[in-house]
């Protein structure tokens, strides 16, 4: 009886270990891109995520990308080839997606469904889809691989009104829309960051020079903070697969939890 019990425990332990995500992929723009810019003055949160988890982070975020260009120009095709069963893919866009397809070669078509607009970019005809369509496409391909897509709202700009961070653009809501439709995890990254910035205060962030070049791109310290906000989301929302891969350093990340208004 004791031997059978021990064998069962060992099998459960082996199963648990095998089920823990070993790879995290990131699809996104410069706010997540970990390659750094502006002579090291700025960086993205994807560079620091691996400091808090035991899984390997594969950061495919590319500066300047929108959901449309990430799909069109091959960045997504490269990422999805590497994804395996049990992996997680973090998907975050919204900063470069503004503007319609005719006025911006990065902009999506209007709407939330299967609407399309055909445009010509640099002499090449392109069928442009809606922003949610691209996110659904990415997420469904991840699911087909036996992996888990996790969508995040975009990061806030350094913009204050009476000591508060304004509400996010429509792209944050689009991420929540796709999350609800496909029943996949959603972290309101914007909300975690914004509410915790407000606790710190605008003056503190200015003193720290967290936005050394513009209102969008973070210093390394601020990018690390944004990575911590991803960890906060994982903890606050008790995303079990990801809680299981948090390391000791993640234990030092203790910020208030905030319910998403989306």
Model-inferred region functions:
Residues 246-262:
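A short, charged, Gly/Pro-tolerant segment at domain boundaries
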Residues 1-18:
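Fungal secretory targeting signals
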Residues 17-62, 77-89, 105-112:
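Serine-esterase "nucleophile elbow" of acetyl-processing enzymes
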Residues 78-220, 224, 228-247:
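Alpha-helical cap/lid subdomain in secreted, periplasmic
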Residues 30, 63-65, 155, 192:
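Short, solvent-exposed coil/turn elements at secondary-structure transition points
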Residues 67-78:
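N-terminal post-signal-peptidase region of extra-cytosolic proteins
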Residues 36-40, 70-72, 161-166:
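Short, solvent-exposed loop/turn segments at secondary-structure boundaries
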Residues 28, 44, 61-64, 94, ...:
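Glycine-centered flexibility sites
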């Amino acid at each position: 009886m004791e031997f059978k019990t021990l064998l069962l425990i060992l099998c459960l332990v082996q199963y648990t270990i095998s089920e823990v995500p070993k790879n995290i992929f990131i699809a996104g723009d410069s706010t997540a891109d970990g390659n750094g810019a502006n002579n090291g003055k700025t960086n993205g949160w994807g560079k620091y995520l691996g400091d808090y988890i035991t899984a390997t982070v594969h950061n495919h975020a590319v500066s300047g990308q929108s959901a449309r260009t990430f799909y069109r120009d091959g960045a997504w095709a490269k990422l999805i080839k590497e994804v395996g069963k049990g992996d997680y893919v973090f998907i975050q866009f919204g900063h470069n997606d503004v503007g319609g397809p005719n006025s911006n070669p990065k902009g999506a078509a209007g709407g939330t469904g299967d609407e399309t607009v055909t445009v010509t970019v640099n002499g090449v005809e392109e069928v442009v889809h809606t922003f949610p369509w691209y996110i659904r496409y990415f997420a469904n391909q991840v699911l087909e691989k036996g992996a888990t897509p996790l969508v995040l709202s975009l990061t806030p700009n350094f913009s204050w009104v009476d000591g508060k961070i304004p509400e996010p653009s429509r792209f944050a809501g689009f991420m929540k829309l796709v999350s609800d439709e496909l029943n996949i995890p959603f972290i309101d990254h914007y909300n975690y960051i914004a509410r915790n910035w407000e606790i710190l205060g605008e003056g503190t962030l200015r003193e720290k020079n967290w936005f050394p070049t513009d209102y969008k791109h973070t210093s390394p310290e601020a990018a690390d903070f944004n990575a911590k906000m991803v960890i906060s989301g994982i903890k606050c929302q008790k995303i079990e697969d990801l809680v299981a891969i948090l390391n000791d350093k993640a234990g030092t990340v203790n910020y208030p939890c905030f319910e998403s208004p989306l």
